[in-house]
């Protein structure tokens, strides 16, 4: 625990407070190369933090970054009286609080996002500050940090001497490994880390090329100016038993319906089955009706799809779901319903916030997946893992599980990507990545069909997958 009466800590704080007061007094008239850098930071943070959230920025300075995020409630904390005074003049809608980052007891939370931008390298005790931030979190809070790379220490020192960058006192120069360790000690779990800004200078075309594209590739990202980290509070298992809605898109699957009723296990306090029948050429709809009548003890709902495609069917099913947890189960039963409790436990233990089934770990039954489909899935798993910044081994496994409240957030953010996905898988995966949800792969044994034929057109869907890669590149990776 930090001893705030430590004379060394007091001297450190007083020196830095005076330093940042002096920086604040001349920042309005000061001109340097920081404009390009801070504009890029605002772009990145606006991607990471949705408008109308509750946002806390620790070491907020003037609050320019915080105001750019358009929060429903924005709180900016800084220990510099001059920074606070000028911040209030610039951004009257922001709540500014003069306080030391090592003691946030005066702040009332919780917050949806907490930001430490270019701050941790200037702190006396990073762990104490992170522990203070942890107190202001709810389970879905995202802590977002960025910090200068040690590699730029010499360049930044030269820029300060040339009056091209704001002067800094002695820094901690934490590495990403240092920061990850401190986050773990303070009650946080890292979701992803990456690099930003290769060229912090306003050079037309080159700035965009370096800062949006080259910085994403090896070896260029090793030379980036800023390291970014997104973390969440370390998870605690759910204590109650959330209810479950299992959404089952079904097209030409009459022969599998009875097995679904017999094999989907009870999960949580209530498990409901929601069938969405989609223009079948066999007796799927009538079969579901009969099975619902034959199983009155199982809460069930049958919907007839008016649109086209699996994505439309999933959205229709989710719109009628009443469970706390939403599950997708393909009616072909290539993923056994008996595996669903594993997904339930993974979500309720909060090991992940989006549980993604993976068919590519265990050996498959002989006819479960054609060789070209298998190779294609391998390629796309590598591509999407790189694009999303989290490991995702299989994008098209039909079984995916998430909290309904997170699905509602994906829906509210859907306009960012548009109506692009005929599968439904990418709408969920991209939406989860955009929300910085913790994505966890859960291996399943993929079975061959026992009834009917696949509804997947290999070449048509392969082309659509390529388009998904391009969309993820444009809207997620190269923002």
Where are each of the predicted segments found?
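Hydrophobic helical membrane-anchoring modules
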Residues: 3, 211-244, 255, 259-266, ...
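Short aromatic/hydrophobic "clamp" motif used to bind/position activated sugar donors
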Residues: 326
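A short glycine-rich, Lys/Arg-flanked "PGG" loop and its adjoining helix->strand segment in the class I
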Residues: 127-139
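Conserved class I S-adenosyl-L-methionine
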Residues: 2-51, 204, 213-214
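A conserved acidic beta->alpha catalytic loop
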Residues: 277-286
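Acceptor/aglycone-binding surface of glycosyltransferases and processive sugar-polymer synthases
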Residues: 152-167, 172, 305-320, 337-418, ...
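Class I SAM-dependent methyltransferase SAM/SAH-binding core
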Residues: 61-103
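Conserved donor nucleotide-binding strand/loop of the catalytic core
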Residues: 97, 285-320
């Amino acid at each position: 625990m930090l001893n705030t009466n430590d004379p060394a800590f007091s001297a450190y704080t007083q020196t830095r407070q005076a330093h940042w007061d002096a920086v604040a007094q001349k920042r309005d008239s000061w001109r340097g190369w920081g404009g390009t850098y801070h504009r890029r930071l605002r772009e990145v943070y606006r991607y990471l933090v949705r408008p109308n959230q509750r946002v806390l920025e620790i070491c907020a300075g003037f609050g320019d970054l915080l105001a750019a995020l358009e929060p429903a409630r924005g709180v900016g904390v800084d220990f510099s009286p001059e920074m606070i005074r000028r911040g209030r003049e610039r951004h009257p809608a922001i709540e500014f609080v003069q306080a030391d980052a090592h003691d946030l007891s005066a702040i009332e939370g919780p917050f949806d996002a907490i930001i430490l931008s270019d701050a941790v390298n200037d702190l006396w005790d990073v762990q104490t500050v992170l522990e203070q931030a942890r107190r202001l979190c709810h389970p879905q809070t995202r802590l977002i940090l960025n910090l200068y790379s040690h590699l730029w220490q010499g360049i930044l020192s030269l820029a300060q001497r040339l009056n091209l960058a704001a002067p800094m006192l002695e820094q901690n120069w934490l590495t990403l490994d240092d920061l990850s360790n401190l986050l773990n000690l303070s009650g946080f779990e890292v979701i992803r880390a990456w690099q930003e800004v290769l060229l912090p200078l306003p050079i037309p075309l080159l700035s965009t090329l370096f800062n949006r594209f080259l910085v994403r590739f090896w070896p260029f990202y090793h030379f980036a100016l800023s390291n970014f980290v997104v973390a969440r509070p370390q998870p605690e298992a759910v204590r109650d038993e959330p209810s479950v809605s299992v959404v089952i898109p079904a097209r030409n699957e009459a022969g599998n319906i009875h097995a679904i009723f017999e094999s989907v296990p009870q999960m949580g306090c209530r498990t409901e089955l929601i069938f969405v029948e989609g223009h079948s050429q066999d007796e799927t709809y009538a079969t579901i009706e009969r099975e619902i009548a034959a199983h009155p003890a199982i809460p069930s709902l049958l919907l007839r799809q008016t649109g086209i495609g699996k994505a439309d069917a999933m959205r229709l099913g989710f719109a009628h779901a009443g469970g706390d947890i939403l599950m997708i189960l393909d009616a072909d039963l290539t993923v056994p319903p008996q595996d669903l409790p594993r997904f339930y436990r993974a979500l309720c233990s909060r090991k992940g916030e989006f549980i993604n089934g993976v068919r590519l770990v265990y050996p498959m039954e002989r006819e479960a997946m054609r060789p070209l489909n298998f190779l294609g899935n391998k390629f796309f798993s590598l591509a999407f893992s790189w694009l999303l910044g989290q490991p995702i081994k299989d994008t098209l496994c039909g079984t995916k599980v998430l909290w309904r409240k997170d699905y509602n957030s994906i829906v509210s953010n859907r306009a960012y990507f548009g109506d692009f996905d005929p599968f439904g898988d990418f709408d969920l995966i991209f939406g989860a990545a955009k929300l910085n949800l913790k994505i966890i792969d859960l291996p399943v044994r993929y079975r061959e069909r026992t009834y009917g034929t696949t509804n997947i057109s290999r070449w048509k869907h392969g082309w659509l997958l390529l388009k998904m890669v391009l969309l993820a590149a444009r809207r997620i990776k190269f923002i």
